[in-house]
């Protein structure tokens, strides 16, 4: 089982992005590439060559690309390892030994890895370029003002809609959550039992949306000063409207493929679908111009449109005996080599370069829905906070599922989640004191 970028996002949305960024397999467009053994040499941290680890991607050509990038670096020989299996567990274990990588790709680093001194501070590498990185994806890689990994590319989720289906019932693309609820109901009623109004996933949306509705209500999972960000009546109102979608029977459930695959949307089983940027090329190929994309609509007077974003990053092991050389290499690759960064983002899948300037220049992202997506990621993107722990994620995910599918009281459910999240934040603070 290899982690995927799609999973990274599920985690960023509030789904146990750590357990599922959140899936195994191919949910992000860069998923499971098979189950062979690790290739490309052993761990590093000794002298001479630098050892670099990547999780095993499923997109054809990616492995060859990263080996080509490494070979182009002339100051030091870089040996790439392509790691199948549970990559997060492998790197967590390797960071505790002298046989791990010098440089490694990471969905993080985690708070424990940062506070445990297992990764190297990379803040100095961002001099003069920090403002060119999407701040939403840089934030979870930052702790107490220091940056611990360089974002490689950005992935995101967004709402797809069929222009012709909305036009048929005289609807505009929904800009508020109320409009989304109403549009989904009208589209379902007009669908002659063949087409549902909205597809959020076969579980009704708890797994795919996560914290997105909270951000759309102007809230957050964790505030910038480290407090619970959704202890507010508007949180319950927002989640109650997800229940309304389910109760109205406006949601497609039991589709042959889940939310991360655009097949249900392409086949006309749903007029609107929550999915990811990775799905855009397939949708465009099948539907031409008969679709558009939107962020999750805002909720309430203090709300704002919202999209979850996430990014794998490049980090340096604190066990490396070549930290200076490792830092110099990843600065060269992920900050200086703009051509490689754009190639990695767009030649083997469909992703956004982590540098805002590169995203704006990329020809594949300049027009239509792709350009809209880049704008949403820049203007409306949020990422899973570093302090949003697995225990808090799990409590929220379970509560959201009960609210949507069982009609549980949102206020009651969220009070329990707020209490659990507060306990987690206190635990984290005690550990750091």
Please provide the spans of the model-predicted regions:
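Short helix-initiation/N-cap motifs at beta->coil->alpha
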Residues: 82-90, 178-179, 254-263
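Conserved N-terminal structural module of periplasmic/extracytoplasmic solute-binding proteins
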Residues: 2-111, 300-302, 325, 412, ...
């Amino acid at each position: 089982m290899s982690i995927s970028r799609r999973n990274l996002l599920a985690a960023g949305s509030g789904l146990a992005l750590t357990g599922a960024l959140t899936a195994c397999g191919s949910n992000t467009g860069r998923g499971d590439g098979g189950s062979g053994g690790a290739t490309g040499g052993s761990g590093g941290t000794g002298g001479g060559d630098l050892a670099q680890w990547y999780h095993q991607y499923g997109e054809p050509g990616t492995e060859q690309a990263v080996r080509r990038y490494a070979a182009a670096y002339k100051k030091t020989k870089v040996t790439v390892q392509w790691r199948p299996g549970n990559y997060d567990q492998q790197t967590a274990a390797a960071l505790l030994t002298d046989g791990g990588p010098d440089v490694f790709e990471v969905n993080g680093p985690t708070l424990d890895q940062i506070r445990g001194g297992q990764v190297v501070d990379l803040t100095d590498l961002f001099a003069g370029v920090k403002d060119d990185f999407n701040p939403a994806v840089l934030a979870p890689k930052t702790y107490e003002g220091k940056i611990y990994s360089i974002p490689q590319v950005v992935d995101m989720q967004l709402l797809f809609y069929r222009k012709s289906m909305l036009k048929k019932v005289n609807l505009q693309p929904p800009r508020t959550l109320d409009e989304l609820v109403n549009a989904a109901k009208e589209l379902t009623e007009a669908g002659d039992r063949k087409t549902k109004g909205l597809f959020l996933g076969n579980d009704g949306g708890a797994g795919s949306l996560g914290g997105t509705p909270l951000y759309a209500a102007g809230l957050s999972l964790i505030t910038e000063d480290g407090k619970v960000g959704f202890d507010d009546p508007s949180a319950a109102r927002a989640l109650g409207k997800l229940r309304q979608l389910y109760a109205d029977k406006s949601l497609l459930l039991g589709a042959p493929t889940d939310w991360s695959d655009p097949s249900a949307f392409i086949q006309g089983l749903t007029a609107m679908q929550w999915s990811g940027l990775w799905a855009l090329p397939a949708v465009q190929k099948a539907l031409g111009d008969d679709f558009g994309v939107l962020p999750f609509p805002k909720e309430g007077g203090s709300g704002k449109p919202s999209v979850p974003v996430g990014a794998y990053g490049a980090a340096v092991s604190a066990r490396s005996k070549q930290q200076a050389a490792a830092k110099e290499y990843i600065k060269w690759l992920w900050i200086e080599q703009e051509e490689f960064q754009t190639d990695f983002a767009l030649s083997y899948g469909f992703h956004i370069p982590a540098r805002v300037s590169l995203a704006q220049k990329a020809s594949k992202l300049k027009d239509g829905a792709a350009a809209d997506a880049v704008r949403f990621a820049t203007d409306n993107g949020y990422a899973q906070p570093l302090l949003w722990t697995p225990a808090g994620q799990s409590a929220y995910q379970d509560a959201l599922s009960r609210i949507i599918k069982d009609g549980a009281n949102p206020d009651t459910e969220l009070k329990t989640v707020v209490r659990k999240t507060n306990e987690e934040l206190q635990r984290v603070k005690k550990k750091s004191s």
